[in-house]
Every structure is written in C-alpha cells, then in structure tokens.
C-alpha cells in the first residue's frame, strides 16, 4: 500500500525544499507525487510573504493541495482541514501517486496522520469562553483546562488563547477527561514521517533572518492589502505571527523594529512548540537538516513509496 510521506519540523528547517526534492526524485524514478499543505496559515489566500508560501513558479511543476483555499475573513478549523486534506490525499492515491504531507502546524499534521475525532462546536459556549479570555487572559483558561483535561492543557501550553478556548469548549461539550490516555491514536493510513531537526543555536539565527526578510520583502504592504480585504475581522488570520505585528505597525501601535522584534520572539516560541510536538512522533525518522546527503537519507527511509 502506498504510504503518506509526511515531512515535518520546525519553521526554518527546509521542509518545503525537501518535499520538492523528494517529489522530483520520485518523478524521475517513474512515480508521481503530489504535495498537501499542512501549514494552517498557508490555507489563506494572499498570506504569502509572512507564511513563506511557495509561489507557483517555485513549485517545480509538482501539484499542490490545500493552499489558498480560505479568505482571510474565514476561520480555519482543524476539523474542516482534516476532512478536505484527507479527501485530497484520497484523490492522490487513486491517481497512483504518492501524497507528501508538508507542514509545521502540529495538530493539522496529526489530524491527517492519526485517527483523531473532532467534536462539533457550540456557539454559545464558544462566545462565553472568548469573553472570559478577553477579560482574564489565557492563564485562567489554562488553569481550568488543566483541571479538566490535563493532557490537552500540557499539549497546548498557557499562551495560545484561541486553542485553549477550543479545548475547553470541547471539554464542556464532551465532559471532563482527567485520565485520558496519552498514547498516540491509531494511524489513519500507513505513513512514513520524516522529521527535520536543527540545533537551536543554528535554528534561531535562521528564524531571525527570516523575519527580517519578511519585512524586506514587503510584508507590511501585503498586510495593508489584506486589511482592506477584511483581515482584522478574521478570527484566525488576524492573529498570525507577523501579520498581527505588521497590522499594529500600520496602526501606529508599534515601530517597525518593535514589530519585527515581537515577531522574532513569537517565532522562536512557536518553533519550540513545534519541536516539542513533533518530538512525540515515536516512529518518525529524524533527519539533520544540515546533512549534505539529506535527500538520499530521506529516500532511504521511503522504500514503500518508490517504484
């Protein structure tokens, strides 16, 4: 059975480049491959510079899925993503190609790879919890979640208010889960996970340089255009790292240097969470992103995907 190839890792480790290299090599060997995005912010049309989204010309003729599928005013939900991404993967498999899942949004990746089930939503509960978040901050929500679902509280951390609200909403809908099993759920489909790693002392300078490049490449102008398209009303998109800071710069709330430095700090924190999340994938093949033979080592781990 053709497996899903998942290329995961922290921001700045070279996931997109490796996924394209794998797809090109498979194509040269007579096996088609298609890429499925698993970066939550790359779902949004027009959010290109700040998400390091590959332009069409940079995709080397490899079909890509789950890019530019939402307006910035729409809310991204992992449940909707799971459904659409799995549908895309099903189509790829039917065409006899190899699906390559690529991204750093941990829950989005896991929602595809594993047998996750996402409860529905309750607008009244959600609105009440969002009011509480606005009034008290994420710390209080996190403490409540820790009492009711300690596994979720530990996974999310104390700062991600939007995800804490969603987790507490799920608990209120489904009931407390103080003893929920911590074992990874069953795989949805056979998969080979390639996890790119990089020492923190080398990753941080890459991340800082990436943020500087975002501003140099025109992130502020991109955000100005998105604000006219309703970015400020987007529950998910308006909070994206870099975009929120550029919007505050445009509003005169931050200087350019303050906006960049806040983005750097948040990007470093996000990368730490990514490393922690993907570190829990026990069956992943760990690959050093600095390796001169990275592609060869990645392909060595994919015998079932090759002709």
From Swiss-Prot:
Sites where the protein binds ATP: 9-16
EC number(s) recorded for this UniProt protein: 2.5.1.75
Names of the cofactor(s): Mg(2+)
Keyword Translocase: no
Pfam families assigned: IPPT
Site location (Interaction with substrate tRNA): 105, 126
Entries under InterPro entries matching the protein: Dimethylallyltransferase, IPT, P-loop_NTPase
GO BP term, pick one: tRNA modification
Gene Ontology molecular function: ATP binding; tRNA dimethylallyltransferase activity
Residues bound to substrate: 11-16
Taxonomy, superkingdom: Bacteria
Reaction catalysed by this enzyme: adenosine(37) in tRNA + dimethylallyl diphosphate = N(6)-dimethylallyladenosine(37) in tRNA + diphosphate
Keywords: ATP-binding, Magnesium, Nucleotide-binding, Transferase, tRNA processing
Family recorded in the similarity comment: Belongs to the IPP transferase family.
NCBIfam families: miaA
Physiological role: Catalyzes the transfer of a dimethylallyl group onto the adenine at position 37 in tRNAs that read codons beginning with uridine, leading to the formation of N6-(dimethylallyl)adenosine (i(6)A).
Subunit structure comment from the entry: Monomer.
Name of the molecule in the record: tRNA dimethylallyltransferase
């Amino acid at each position: 059975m053709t497996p899903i190839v998942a290329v995961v890792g922290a921001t700045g480790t070279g996931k997109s480049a490796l996924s394209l290299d794998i797809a090109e090599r498979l194509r040269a060997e007579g096996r088609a491959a298609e890429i499925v995005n698993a970066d939550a912010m790359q779902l949004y049309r027009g959010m290109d510079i700040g998400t390091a989204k590959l332009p069409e010309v940079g995709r080397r003729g490899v079909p890509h899925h789950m890019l530019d599928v939402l307006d910035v005013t729409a809310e991204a939900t992992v449940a909707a993503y799971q459904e659409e991404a799995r549908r895309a993967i099903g189509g790829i498999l039917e065409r006899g190609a190899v699906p390559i899942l690529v991204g750093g949004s941990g829950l989005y990746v896991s929602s595809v790879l594993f047998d996750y089930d996402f409860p529905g939503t309750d607008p009244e509960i959600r609105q009440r919890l969002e009011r509480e978040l606005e009034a008290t901050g994420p710390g209080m929500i996190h403490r409540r979640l820790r009492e009711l679902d300690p596994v979720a509280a530990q996974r999310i951390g104390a700062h991600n208010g939007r995800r804490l609200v969603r987790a507490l909403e799920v608990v209120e809908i489904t009931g407390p889960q103080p003893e929920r099993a911590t074992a990874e759920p069953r795989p949805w489909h056979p998969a080979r996970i390639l996890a790119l790693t990089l020492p923190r002392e080398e990753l941080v300078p890459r991340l800082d340089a990436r943020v500087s490049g975002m501003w140099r490449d025109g992130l502020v102008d991109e955000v100005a255009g998105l604000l006219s398209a309703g970015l400020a009303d987007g529950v998910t998109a308006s909070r994206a790292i870099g975009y929120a800071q550029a919007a505050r710069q445009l509003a005169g709330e931050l200087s350019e240097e303050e906006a960049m430095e806040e983005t750097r700090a948040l990007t470093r924190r996000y990368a730490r969470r990514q490393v922690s999340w993907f570190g829990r994938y026990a069956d992943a093949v760990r690959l050093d992103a600095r390796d001169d033979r990275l592609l060869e080592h990645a392909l060595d781990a994919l015998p079932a995907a090759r002709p």
